[in-house]
Amino acid sequence: MLKIGSHVSMSGKKMLLAASEEAVSYGATTFMIYTGAPQNTRRKPIEELNIEAGRKHMEQNGIEEIIVHAPYIINVGNTTKPETFQLGVDFLRMEIERTSALGVAKQIVLHPGAHVGAGADAGIQQIIKGLNEVLTPDQTVNIALETMAGKGTECGRSFEEIAKIIDGVKYNEKLSVCFDTCHTHDAGYDIVNDFDGVLNEFDKIVGIDRLQVLHINDSKNVRGAGKDRHENIGFGHIGYKALHHIVHHPQLTHVPKILETPYVGEDKKDKKPPYKLEIEMLKNGTFDEGLLEKIKAQ
């Protein structure tokens, strides 16, 4: 079975149940959530996440595994502000606890961090320090380090940087990788013409067994732009053919594929989610040039 889904919202009273219902409405077989708003630290207590009803709904609809994304505000790469680093460490610990409580997620996707001017090496050392403070040998969920586009002072823009972080962490069996197609493309990897070559390079430097999550996004920018702006499937510089190849790659059949493509529409208050039609299109093997119009008409 193809494990494919998108980012969905976990909110209101229904929480995990609402997320599962949204995912199922898209024809998804997995999904990704934030356990609260990605841009702040406000979180509902675990008892209010409606876990039991959510898990039951998932089971009824054949969804076995989901992904959690850590909030953007976590930056364990910060060497200049001890309070920012500490917030990141404390909050990551809390996210591990919350994700464990869900019982259906094995991976927490984390943007490794930004060095905020101290240099990549200093940032990487700080990320290692933070992860060493957070990870324990008995935790049941992994931290999936996301491949980054290289925007600003982001660490993790190359496979070498990801490998350096992993190598420095004591309990690194608790680390995996989330491979983001838009980010890797924007960082300069040729996933359009030579994805197999890129995957081989990843295997040599990091190890393909670490690749446990895929973010499937097209890119608004040319390869190597270092920008990180997602585009709808087939409408960017990566293109449908390359993304379809990645989604159906024989070495990655077990890996959940998560779409984070933009909502569609000119009216900011009435943008439509693209995921149902994008998932269908990635399953059926044919690019639909009229997709965006169909999404708007939903």
From Swiss-Prot:
It comes from the Bacteria. Its cofactor is Zn(2+). The keyword Phosphoprotein does not apply. One of its GO terms (molecular function) is phosphoric diester hydrolase activity. Keywords: DNA damage, DNA repair, Endonuclease, Hydrolase, Metal-binding, Nuclease, Zinc. GO terms for biological process: base-excision repair. Zn(2+) 3 binds at H183, D228, H230. It holds the Pfam family AP_endonuc_2. It catalyses: Endonucleolytic cleavage to 5'-phosphooligonucleotide end-products. SUPFAM superfamilies: Xylose isomerase-like (SSF51658). CDD domains: AP2Ec. Its EC number is 3.1.21.2. Zn(2+) 2 binds at E146, D180, H215, E260. Zn(2+) 1 binds at H69, H111, E146. The keyword Membrane does not apply. Disulfide bonds: none annotated. Binds 3 Zn(2+) ions. Endonuclease IV plays a role in DNA repair. It cleaves phosphodiester bonds at apurinic or apyrimidinic (AP) sites, generating a 3'-hydroxyl group and a 5'-terminal sugar phosphate. Belongs to the AP endonuclease 2 family. This is Probable endonuclease 4. It comes from Bacillus thuringiensis (strain Al Hakam). The gene is nfo.
